[in-house]
Swiss-Prot record:
Highest taxon in the source lineage: Bacteria
Family: Belongs to the prokaryotic pantothenate kinase family.
Annotated GO MF terms: ATP binding; pantothenate kinase activity
EC number, as in UniProt: 2.7.1.33
Compartments it resides in: Cytoplasm
GO cellular component terms given for this protein: cytoplasm
Protein name: Pantothenate kinase
Catalytic activity: (R)-pantothenate + ATP = (R)-4'-phosphopantothenate + ADP + H(+)
Pfam families per record: PRK
Biological process, per Gene Ontology: coenzyme A biosynthetic process
Annotated source species: Lactococcus lactis subsp. lactis (strain IL1403)
Assigned keywords, A-Z: ATP-binding, Coenzyme A biosynthesis, Cytoplasm, Kinase, Nucleotide-binding, Transferase
Length: 306
């Protein structure tokens, strides 16, 4: 069966004409401040792709508010509108983080009186010591390396308007930062970004997907993602060259050809397998798929029909 049978395929040109918005445009400096390493994004992308998406999210938020109001009428009591939770998934190096930060900024502009928080699921990885003790350090990034029960608990608490402390993951140290956390306290909108956002833990009464009001999958051809991953790996090495505390510093002492081979080996052994077996199969669970081509250019959008 065609995976996209339940989606409308919309060209970028058609999509950009679906809605004209009055949201103040971003400056180039603002856009640069949220751009991830080696990601490509322009003000034209914001205007063509992301502002119509913001309008669509506005409709989903209104629908959530209307449903809460209707439930209150039925139950004859006040029902507080829960936060709108947006999930963003996709492969390593595909540009999820940039999309998440951009949406946070644009939603903050669209709803200036509301709180818009952003959390990455990296914070729910087990610590390096825990992974070693569990004997799965070489499986870091795969589903079993995440504390999915804690992630589910986090989403449950947020939906119920309760405070939650989220661990903070450092890409510099390649581990959870000890004694540091991000406090999420009753946001109006929450964006959750990570490779496992649309994955469901087994043997759970509650699925992660139950908590999302809207979900996005950032998609691209596997060969392109590999290219972007290798480029990012190279950029990370350059940043780590003079920082001995950086996880990637250890690789800066290696000959260039060996570093390239190492990056390719990590891609083939970890990231490609993870993409094929665990990430891409969740793609059709998303409400919308942003499809990228060369230079991270979004050429088409898939919107779920029902």
């Amino acid at each position: 069966m065609n995976e996209f049978i339940n989606f409308d395929e919309i060209s970028r040109k058609t999509w950009q004409n679906l809605y004209n918005t009055s949201i103040a445009p971003l400056t180039h400096d603002e856009l640069e401040s949220i751009r991830s390493l080696n990601d490509e994004i322009s003000l034209q992308d914001v205007e063509d792709v992301y502002l119509p998406l913001i309008h669509l999210l506005r409709l989903y938020k209104k629908n959530l508010e209307d449903m809460s109001y209707s439930k209150g009428l039925f139950l004859q009591k006040i029902v507080k509108t829960p936060p709108l939770i947006i999930g963003i998934s996709g492969s390593v190096a595909v540009g999820k983080s940039t999309t998440a930060r951009l949406l946070q900024l644009l939603l903050s502009r669209a709803f200036p009186k509301l709180t818009v928080d952003l959390v990455t699921t990296d914070g729910f990885l087990y610590t390096t010591n825990d992974l070693k003790n569990m004997g799965i350090l070489d499986r870091k990034g795969f589903p079993e390396s995440y504390d999915m029960e804690k992630l589910t608990s986090f989403l449950y608490h947020v939906k119920n308007g309760e405070k939650f402390e989220v661990p903070i993951y450092s890409h510099e140290t390649y581990d959870i930062l000890p004694n540091q956390s991000q406090i999420i306290d009753s946001p109006d909108i929450l964006i959750v970004e990570g490779i496992n956002v649309l994955q469901n833990p087994q043997n759970q009464l509650l699925y992660i997907s139950d908590f999302y009001d809207f979900s996005i999958y950032v998609d691209a051809d596997e060969k392109l993602i590999e290219k972007w991953y290798l480029e990012r790996f190279d950029s990370l090495l350059k940043l780590a060259k003079y920082d001995q505390t950086n996880f990637y510093h250890q690789f800066t002492k290696m000959p260039e050809d060996k570093v390239i081979n190492l990056a390719r080996e990590i891609w083939a052994r970890v990231n490609r397998v993870n993409l094929r077996e665990y990430i891409e199969p969740t793609r059709n669970r998303a409400e919308i798929i942003l499809h990228k081509t060369e230079n991270h250019y979004i050429d088409k959008i898939y919107l779920k029909k029902f």
